[in-house]
Amino acid sequence: MLFYDFLGGRKKSEKHKNVSKKNTIELFPKLKKVNLRKSFIFQDAQTDDSKLVLSLLRTAVEINNSTAINYLNVKNIFKKNKFYEIHLFCELTGAEYSVSAKKIIAASGVHNLPGDYKEVSTKLKMSGGAHLVLKGDPLEINNNGVFLPKTEDERVMFVLPWNGNTIVGTTDVEKFSGTKDNPHASKEEIDYLIRHVKKYFDVENIEYTSSWSGIRALIDDQNNSTKKIMRGHVIEEIDKNFIQIAGGKLTGFRLIAIEALRQLFNKRFELQDIEYQDQIINYQNYYNLSDLEHSIKHYCVATPVDYL
């Protein structure tokens, strides 16, 4: 934790603190007391990933005149002289399109590059991570997060407050349930999470209101299991003026973008080149019925999730 404080450049008031057994029990009354000696408190960040992504998209579209399109898949990419021809497919209408580009940055997440570039894509290993949502605060964590230091498969878990409810997660499985585009928590993963909550908290029954799963795209090192693979990112040149971003975390999106631009344009972009006073547009829930109708007509809103 001292190293964690050092890397974060934390002020004295923000550094981690040791907490006695007595005070730990006062903070977390449902935490099991057997083998409990003490705990420590540290500060970390929390973000709403969905709203952050939507805020970034709004900023790109409204300030930087970018174009963001949903449900439009890249089916193939061909090189033609100094240009790339990109074949697109609309999932909603079945229409096909073709566009040209001088430069490409592919950030395709869990998916390989299409067509002729599939074999030269960055090699990835998928890891599924399931979560449970508990209604309210049944574990009495009192708006604090709890870091569970050790699981049966040598990992860690978190219990976190979230919008008036509690989130428990996560797992790390190579054989995830569902598809890459629609993963879901398996019974085994749900049982795993409940079992570990009961290991640390004095509760008989765990009732969850929902579960979900996400897929991490990790850089395949050919040797380690997913839980041992570093969560870093790589930026590789697939072809001239064509790079792929793979791996990484959402919290590093700005640094990853700068590195990608440096590599693609062979220019020294620096952090100070970014105008931080031009803040990301805040995503707010201010839409009314006319906005919904406009979104359905013009922005390929096919499901309630798309609109939200």
Task: Describe each region flagged by the PLM.
Residues 74-77, 158-159, 235:
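A structural signal for short hydrophobic beta-strand segments in well-ordered beta-sheet cores
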Residues 106-119:
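Flavin (primarily FAD) binding-site architecture
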